[in-house]
Each structure stands twice: as C-alpha cells, then as structure tokens.
C-alpha cells in the first residue's frame, strides 16, 4: 500500500487492514519456520505497510489531540 492510499482511508478501515496484515505476517513467520515460505520479499512489504499505517494513525491521533 502506498501512502496516498493509506491516507485516503478512514481510521476504522486502517485498523481492519492492520489486523489483517499482522495476521498475514504471523502466518508467513510460521511458514518460514516450517520451510514452506517461497515469497520472502513479502516480509518486508508487510512490515513497511504496517509501519506506514501506524505512522498515519499516530499522526491523526496527535492532530486530534492538538486540535
């Protein structure tokens, strides 16, 4: 997900996406441990998406707090 797509979504949608990404990340970790994961590059994509979502959510919280 790119930053423009993330910022255009509501906070509720971002929370749902965040939960799904975290579940997918955990599943990839288990697959890697069992040597069944063939798409290692997906790890970094998921981690970066999670970081972008958390950054956007924290920015919104700070803006609401300061408003």
Curated annotation (Swiss-Prot):
GO cellular component, one term: ribonucleoprotein complex
Coiled-coil portions: none
InterPro entries: Ribosomal_uL29 (IPR001854), Ribosomal_uL29_sf (IPR036049)
One Pfam family, short name: Ribosomal_L29
SUPFAM superfamilies: Ribosomal protein L29 (L29p)
KW Ribonucleoprotein (keyword) present: yes
Keyword Membrane: no
GO molecular function, one term: structural constituent of ribosome
Keywords, alphabetical: Ribonucleoprotein, Ribosomal protein
GO terms (BP aspect): translation
Family: Belongs to the universal ribosomal protein uL29 family.
Protein name per the record: Large ribosomal subunit protein uL29
Native source organism of the sequence: Wolbachia pipientis wMel
């Amino acid at each position: 997900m790119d930053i423009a797509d993330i910022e255009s979504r509501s906070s509720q949608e971002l929370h749902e996406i965040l939960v799904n990404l975290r579940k997918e990340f955990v599943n990839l970790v288990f697959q890697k441990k069992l040597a069944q994961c063939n798409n290692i590059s997906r790890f970094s994509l998921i981690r970066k998406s999670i970081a972008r979502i958390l950054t956007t959510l924290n920015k919104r919280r700070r803006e609401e707090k300061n408003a």
